[in-house]
Amino acid sequence: MPAQKIDGKLIAQQVRQHVKSHVESIVSSGKRPPGLAVVLVGSDAASHVYVTNKRRACEEVGFVSKSYDLPSTTSQQKLLELIDTLNADEEIDGILVQLPLPAGLDKEQVLERILPHKDVDGFHPYNIGRLAQRIPALRPCTPKGIMTLIESTKRPIKGLDAVIVGASNIVGRPMFMELLLAGCTVTSCHKFTKDLQSHVERADLIVVAVGISAFIPGEWIKPGAIVIDVGINRQTDGTLIGDVDYATAEKRAGWITPVPGGVGPMTVASLIENTLEAYVKYHSN
């Protein structure tokens, strides 16, 4: 029996609709809507697409979206000064600096300059630390979205053997903490892991985020497992495929995310959720 497809597009639309309804209630009570500032430095084509999607999502739910498109020659100091200005702006609840930044700019310093309660990407060390201490505040967007996808399966995950392939700061590491918080027994696999196959084959739940086309053979997937494929890899013919061999994995898994239309839409939906949360928890008074 083929796996049930986890429809990220549908679930993301449901999240956005929920946020939109909340914003309409806020505005009808006479309060200002939430505000998100999006900062883009340089002319990276993929970044422009991502930023456009984020701005469109903001407008759809009724946020005020402010855009700051800066040239690739922008200095570190000018970028930090802009963040300081946005930190002080009482009508801005979230600040998003689109990554990657052009060469010569210090990403860590930039991200740490954003006030933790305006860090709607969830990358600030304070927010990562809160997640590690089991008291999450603003959570990293992609792992948060993945948890929403997993919850949609209705399968209890407490006690499951969960395996994460990939240990990036954006997905793998915070994903480990999310699944640990949810009660899974979690294994983190990375480029130094020996016998990756044995880890994957025992996983009741697997999250793959390495950016390599069909890196995980479908034959490795445990029957009935939940498979979350974070990879988005463009092929020479223009098609997009994930990090898991979908055609074979789909025949073995219990649930699986497609590529595209799985994890990707949830990252933006989680950003929208975080912006509303920042407004409600930290700025609405």
Curated annotation (Swiss-Prot):
Pathway recorded for this protein: One-carbon metabolism; tetrahydrofolate interconversion
Chemical reaction(s) catalysed: (6R)-5,10-methylene-5,6,7,8-tetrahydrofolate + NADP(+) = (6R)-5,10-methenyltetrahydrofolate + NADPH; (6R)-5,10-methenyltetrahydrofolate + H2O = (6R)-10-formyltetrahydrofolate + H(+)
Molecular-function GO terms, alphabetical: methenyltetrahydrofolate cyclohydrolase activity; methylenetetrahydrofolate dehydrogenase (NADP+) activity
Keywords: Amino-acid biosynthesis, Histidine biosynthesis, Hydrolase, Methionine biosynthesis, Multifunctional enzyme, NADP, One-carbon metabolism, Oxidoreductase, Purine biosynthesis
Superkingdom, taxonomy of origin: Bacteria
Residues given in the record as NADP(+) binding sites: 166-168, 232
GO CC annotation terms, alphabetical: cytosol
Pfam name, any one: THF_DHG_CYH_C
GO BP terms in the entry: L-histidine biosynthetic process; methionine biosynthetic process; purine nucleotide biosynthetic process; tetrahydrofolate interconversion
EC annotation from Swiss-Prot or TrEMBL: 1.5.1.5, 3.5.4.9
Family, per entry: Belongs to the tetrahydrofolate dehydrogenase/cyclohydrolase family.
Function according to Swiss-Prot or TrEMBL: Catalyzes the oxidation of 5,10-methylenetetrahydrofolate to 5,10-methenyltetrahydrofolate and then the hydrolysis of 5,10-methenyltetrahydrofolate to 10-formyltetrahydrofolate.
Subunit structure: Homodimer.
Record's protein name: Bifunctional protein FolD
Species, as recorded: Pseudoalteromonas atlantica (strain T6c / ATCC BAA-1087)
Taxonomic lineage: Bacteria, Pseudomonadati, Pseudomonadota, Gammaproteobacteria, Alteromonadales
